[in-house]
């Protein structure tokens, strides 16, 4: 009979002790995100959270997302500090468009070989994103899967649950009307979409993103600028300003052409005034370097616009003043119009706002 060496889990590539070390590293950052509704801490089989008592007819709103191939850039450039903010932003910004207050967030971190420093850095970013959004990081899953990923590679996914009063649910399909004004909220940059095309352009440019400067800032800084989280600004707008928000669109994958129609009723379209804003320099660089036509830019990227709010024209000035007062860059970008066809929902024009 042949003697066999006694194997253990670590021999197979899974270091349980590293997982324990990671939990200890992140406990403080996680606890700082907790809301009064959170019951208990890390370590249970399931996270517990009560509904805020202020809601009479609470509607739960959930969302899940990732950060796409922006993660590939972060890994290649060894910049792990802010990708977690992106992960939270992609989820909570989808909730706020329906008027929902994010309650809690969970993350999924999968890797070929767990590097405690890298994972702790990423999760610290997730905790920072949760603090920006006012939601609690209540748990997650760290999966070490040798053979599934290259050793230092990792993947991320996030899940968020929020709540909105039934009477305050924002439903564009029911509320948007021809004549509504569209307000834009500036993005912080590319956010977390279009990065497969971004990486192609970067390869074509042959630029070193760490050393090549664009308007006084490294290309790497532009490309990895964290996604802006709009939750607190929009929630405060809803709760304090008595404005009748008809719809909010989050400009993510698919840009203008895919996201704005998601909140439009039938027989409506939107007119966008291109001259109402100037693209941030990173979008100009991408278009020029990649020889990308303007329609493709609008279909792939946010081009400097993170959110679009539809509301009655007589409430536009008040809303703009408030958004500016809470630190948002906002402006009139267009209006809703009637349409007899469903084929052309987004129309770009040089000038429409004074017509």
Swiss-Prot record:
Main localization, broad class: cytoplasm
EC category name: ligase
Reaction equations catalysed: 2-formamido-N(1)-(5-O-phospho-beta-D-ribosyl)acetamidine + ATP = 5-amino-1-(5-phospho-beta-D-ribosyl)imidazole + ADP + phosphate + H(+)
Keywords for the protein's UniProt record, in alphabetical order: ATP-binding, Cytoplasm, Ligase, Nucleotide-binding, Purine biosynthesis
Enzyme Commission code(s) on record: 6.3.3.1
Compartment(s): Cytoplasm
Superkingdom, natural source: Bacteria
Pathway named in the protein's UniProt entry: Purine metabolism; IMP biosynthesis via de novo pathway; 5-amino-1-(5-phospho-D-ribosyl)imidazole from N(2)-formyl-N(1)-(5-phospho-D-ribosyl)glycinamide: step 2/2
InterPro entries documented for this protein: PurM-like_C_dom, PurM-like_C_sf, PurM-like_N, PurM-like_N_sf, PurM_cligase
GO molecular function annotations of the record: ATP binding; phosphoribosylamine-glycine ligase activity; phosphoribosylformylglycinamidine cyclo-ligase activity
PANTHER family registered for this protein in UniProt: TRIFUNCTIONAL PURINE BIOSYNTHETIC PROTEIN ADENOSINE-3, TRIFUNCTIONAL PURINE BIOSYNTHETIC PROTEIN ADENOSINE-3-RELATED
Similarity annotation: Belongs to the AIR synthase family.
Name the UniProt record assigns to this protein: Phosphoribosylformylglycinamidine cyclo-ligase
């Amino acid at each position: 009979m042949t003697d066999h060496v006694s194997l253990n889990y670590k021999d197979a590539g899974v270091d349980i002790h590293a997982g324990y070390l990671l939990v200890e590293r992140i406990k403080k950052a996680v606890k700082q995100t907790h809301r009064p509704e959170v019951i208990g801490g890390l370590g249970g089989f399931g996270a517990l959270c009560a509904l805020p008592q202020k809601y009479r007819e609470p509607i739960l709103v959930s969302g899940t997302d990732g950060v796409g191939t922006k993660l590939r850039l972060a890994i290649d450039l060894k910049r792990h500090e802010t990708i977690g903010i992106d992960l939270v932003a992609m989820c909570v910004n989808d909730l706020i468009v329906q008027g929902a207050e994010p309650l809690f967030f969970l993350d999924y971190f999968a890797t070929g070989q767990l590097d405690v420093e890298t994972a702790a850095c990423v999760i610290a970013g997730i905790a920072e994103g949760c603090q920006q959004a006012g939601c609690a990081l209540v748990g997650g899953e760290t999966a070490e899967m040798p053979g599934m990923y290259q050793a230092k590679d990792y993947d991320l996914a996030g899940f968020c649950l929020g709540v909105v009063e039934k009477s305050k649910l924002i439903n564009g399909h029911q509320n948007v009307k021809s004549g509504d004004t569209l307000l834009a909220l500036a993005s912080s940059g590319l956010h977390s979409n279009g990065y497969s095309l971004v990486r192609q352009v970067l390869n074509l440019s042959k630029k070193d993103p760490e050393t090549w400067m664009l308007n006084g800032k490294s290309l790497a800084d532009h490309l990895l600028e964290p996604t802006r989280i709009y939750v607190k600004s929009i929630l405060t707008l809803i709760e304090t300003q008595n404005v009748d928000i008809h719809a909010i669109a989050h400009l993510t994958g698919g840009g203008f052409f895919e996201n704005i129609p998601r909140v439009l009723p039938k027989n409506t379209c939107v007119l966008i005034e291109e001259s109402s804003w100037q693209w941030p320099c990173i979008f100009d660089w991408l278009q020029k370097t990649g020889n990308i036509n303007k329609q493709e830019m609008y279909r792939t990227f946010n081009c400097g616009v993170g959110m679009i709010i539809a509301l009655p024209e007589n409430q536009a000035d008040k809303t703009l003043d408030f958004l500016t007062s809470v630190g948002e860059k906002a402006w009139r970008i267009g209006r809703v119009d009637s349409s007899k066809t469903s084929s052309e929902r987004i129309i770009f024009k040089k000038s429409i706002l004074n017509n």
